Regions:
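Short beta-strand-to-loop acidic/aromatic patch adjacent to the donor-nucleotide binding site
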Residues: 89-98
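Conserved donor NDP-sugar-binding/catalytic core segment of glycosyltransferases
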Residues: 100-135
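A conserved acidic beta->alpha catalytic loop
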Residues: 42-52, 71
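Glycine-rich, basic loop-to-helix element that forms the pyrophosphate-binding segment
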Residues: 69-87
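Cell-envelope/extracellular polymer assembly enzymes that use nucleotide-activated donors
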Residues: 6-8, 38
Length: 334
């Protein structure tokens, strides 16, 4: 079977018309192996020129559909909605509107789909160049925070996976919910030898509240950031050792040196944009993660969680609630 027989693509977009158009140009370039795949453009109610560009491509290519949300549901909810569009092809790829593609490694992706690999990682900027660590699930999870890194295969997106994905929209990474469930059931991740997609940083607004009245977005969603969201998702791994290793990989960047995820991102953005503000952001986030969040994560996993879920604590809490309820009933009767 060919790529277009195996793969459906959903492109999520919101108010990035110039980058969106560049993305479409790459997808429909003469050397693009996915130019004949079914492509759904999932527009999160854009107010710029995005709808006009999408309609133009839909009129030029019969394999392109343009869907516009009735409301701006938020970027993460739009990701979950894109996951829900899985089918009828066995493989599903959700991509963004501002990234860069190199198609040289695509033959390996097609071979992996033909073999029936369940989960394929096509991004590798945060992975070791070679060796067994390249396909280590702990390392892959932090790479897969970058949405287009993931191609979902048969049986990965299920009813429960979709429920969990929607439940995790506030935690930034709803697309990791099916991955975590796959790993919980003993699944593996196939990592291709040469990455296909890299993040394209254009210096535009990448906040999770774009298009919303930011002061009215509920606190849980407004204040969640990368490390917290990642800790929430990896906290759902049944393998506690893998959970800890995954979080450690994000914080310390074990495969790319102590500089880690934030250091590499800072250098990348610094080189592309030349903004000194990124330095301050990197210093603040690295200090917070290394000195505060990771120790708290360890305390939670090794002490607080076992304590709060113990039978003794549960029974003590139940007795206390029974006593308080009894007092409340007496007051009502008197």
């Amino acid at each position: 079977m060919t790529t277009e027989q195996l793969l459906d693509i959903v492109l999520i977009t919101f108010n990035r018309a110039p980058q969106f158009e560049k993305t479409l140009e790459m997808l429909f370039a003469p050397d693009s192996p996915v130019r004949n795949c079914a492509l759904t453009i999932l527009d999160n109610k854009s107010t710029d020129e995005t709808p006009q560009i999408a309609e133009r491509y839909a009129s030029l290519y019969p394999n392109v559909k343009h869907h516009v949300n009735n409301f701006n549901v938020g970027g993460n909810a739009n990701i979950a909605k894109a996951l829900e569009m899985y089918g009828p092809k066995p493989y599903h790829w959700v991509i963004c509107d501002d990234d860069v593609y190199n198609w040289e490694g695509w033959p390996e992706v097609e071979e992996a789909m033909q073999r029936g690999e369940k989960l394929i990682c096509v991004g590798d900027r945060h992975l070791a160049k070679n060796g067994p660590k390249r396909s280590d699930p702990a390392e892959c999870l932090q790479q897969m925070t970058f949405l287009p890194s993931i191609i979902y295969g048969p049986g990965i997106i299920t009813d429960t996976a979709m429920r969990n994905a929607y439940d995790c929209t506030f935690a930034l990474f709803p697309h990791l919910a099916p991955v975590v469930m796959h790993l919980n059931h003993g699944g593996s991740i196939y990592v291709i030898k040469q990455g296909i997609v890299l993040p394209g940083c254009y210096g535009n607004d990448a906040s999770i509240t774009r298009g919303d009245v930011k002061t009215e977005v509920f606190t849980r969603s407004r204040t969640t950031y990368l490390a917290v969201g990642f800790a929430i998702l990896t906290g759902e791994l049944w393998d506690r050792k893998l959970s800890k290793r995954a979080f450690k990989a994000l914080v310390y960047g074990s495969q790319i040196g102590w500089f880690g995820f934030y250091g590499q991102t800072f250098l990348y953005l610094r080189g592309r944009e030349g903004s000194a503000n990124f330095h301050a952001i990197w210093l603040q986030s690295t200090f917070l993660m290394r000195c505060v969040l990771y120790p708290l994560h360890l305390i939670q996993n090794s002490f607080l969680y076992p304590l709060l879920t113990s039978k003794r604590i549960y029974n003590a809490g139940k007795r206390l609630m029974d006593r308080l309820n009894g007092r409340a009933r007496k007051k009502l009767q008197s």
